[in-house]
A protein has these predicted regions:
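N-terminal secretory signal peptides
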Residues: 1-3
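N-terminal export signals
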Residues: 6-28
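Flexible C-terminal active-site loop/helix
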Residues: 35-55, 73, 81, 327-383
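Metal- or metallocofactor-binding catalytic centers and their adjacent structured scaffolds
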Residues: 39-50, 66, 79, 84-152
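Short Pro/Gly-enriched beta-strand edge/turn motifs at strand-loop
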Residues: 54-62
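Conserved, mostly hydrophobic/aromatic
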Residues: 76, 82, 141, 154, ...
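Catalytic alpha/beta core domains of metabolic enzymes, predominantly
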Residues: 257-262, 268, 274, 278-349
Length: 383
């Protein structure tokens, strides 16, 4: 026979799985009036606070279109009945979002109108309706709310989703564009810690970069061309050459506007082709089938964990492969993304490893593999 606490948790899990609110899930049962269930949606208000936080990179980060040594970020906390959920918005340049736009958006969010934090769909539908964009700001609220709800349930989200943490894959570690000497140093520094590398290409010296890495490591490599190859014939020639160098997948080989050219490349490619810049939200997934073999889901682009889970589910239904990625982020957002990792083919969750001022301890990389804890919510603690 269940005790009261176990009953409430069971009701909460049932509510999330069925789309009911906690109040609806509890409606058919008689709960003693002397038993407090404030933490499961019978009173109290959610309070959200947020503040800017600049992420400092350990090394200058260079891709095909820019270089940077910091990344703007906004930290979010949602408190309910003494329990706090954490989230964040990370804003690399290409997102087109800034600290000012994120702060302005968050000031419009009124969570106090909701009594039940388990009303995830209602709350996040409301948050999404505030503006057509602001995906990173929306993701910050989504992550914090998922962390809060998971903590109230006493379970990590991978368990709530029915996943097994042992199935989490290895994560890639990104080697940014740099001089040959620096790239060799970076590769040697991490080669013994990771099982697969990721290399940013899309410049004239692409082959030289791969040869530089191959001079010191034979690890499998995932390639992110960052839309850098403009001609489809050049892109296909590069992919054939890269396959001979032990590359295992290609991400966004061509500009997102060149979908037909990308489809031509994908249909003839000996390696799987994944969408990154061509993909943002759930509504984009179906249109990419045929043009790409898979998709790279990033919380900062898709508004968070709720939509990421839907995108993953749809991609699987369309027989597409899935990668879970990240921006330069603290362990907060990386750990949130990692909750989905047992269900994906590839993971690129090294954003927290690229910064020197992480605020959290969360997902770990052990012998190159994503290792999830049993901590509830998104599995993080503040440092």
């Amino acid at each position: 026979m269940q005790n009261r606490r176990d009953f409430l948790k069971t009701a909460a899990f049932a509510a999330i799985g069925s789309g009911l609110t906690i109040r609806q899930a509890l409606a058919a049962e008689t709960v003693p009036t002397t038993f407090s269930i404030n933490r499961l949606g019978k009173g109290g208000k959610m309070k959200m606070t947020f503040f800017p936080y600049e992420l400092k990179l350990k090394h200058v980060f260079t891709v095909a279109s820019y270089s940077r040594s910091t990344t703007p970020d906004v930290q979010v906390e949602i408190e309910y009945e003494g329990v706090t959920g954490y989230g964040e918005a990370s804003m690399p340049p290409y997102l087109g979002q800034t600290v000012d736009t994120v702060m302005a958006f968050l000031k419009k969010v009124n969570l106090e109108q909701f009594d039940d934090p388990f009303q995830l769909d209602d709350i996040l539908t409301y948050v999404d309706s505030i503006s057509p964009g602001d995906t990173a700001a929306k993701a910050a609220v989504d992550i914090a709310l998922h962390d809060l709800v998971g903590k109230l349930l006493g379970a990590p989200w991978y368990k709530i989703w029915g996943l097994t943490k042992e199935k989490a894959p290895s994560t890639t570690f990104t080697i940014g564009i740099d001089t040959p000497e620096v790239m060799r140093e970076k590769t040697l520094e991490v080669a013994g810690q990771f099982n697969i590398l990721k290399v940013k290409l899309g410049r004239e010296n692409d082959k030289e970069m791969i040869q530089t890495i191959r001079s010191v490591s034979n690890l499998p490599i995932a390639i992110d061309a960052n839309q850098g190859w403009k001609d489809k014939h050049h892109a296909l020639d590069m992919i054939h050459w890269l396959k001979e160098q032990g590359i295992v997948m290609i991400e966004q080989p061509m500009p997102k506007e060149q979908l037909d050219d990308t489809a031509w490349v994908t249909q003839q490619s000996p390696l799987p082709i994944f969408a990154d810049e061509s993909l943002q939200r759930l509504c984009d997934v179906a249109a990419l089938r045929g043009a790409f073999n898979g998709i790279n889901i990033k919380l900062m682009k898709c508004t968070g964990m709720r939509e990421a889970w839907k995108m993953l589910t749809l991609a699987r239904a369309l027989d597409m492969r899935v990668m879970i990625g990240c921006m330069t982020e603290t362990s907060c957002a990386c750990s949130a993304a990692a909750q989905l990792s047992p269900a994906v083919d590839f993971a690129d969750l090294d954003g927290n490893l690229l910064i020197s001022n992480d605020r959290f301890r969360g997902m770990e990389v052990v012998k190159g593999k994503i290792t999830l804890s049993d901590l509830p919510g998104i599995g993080v603690t503040k440092i």
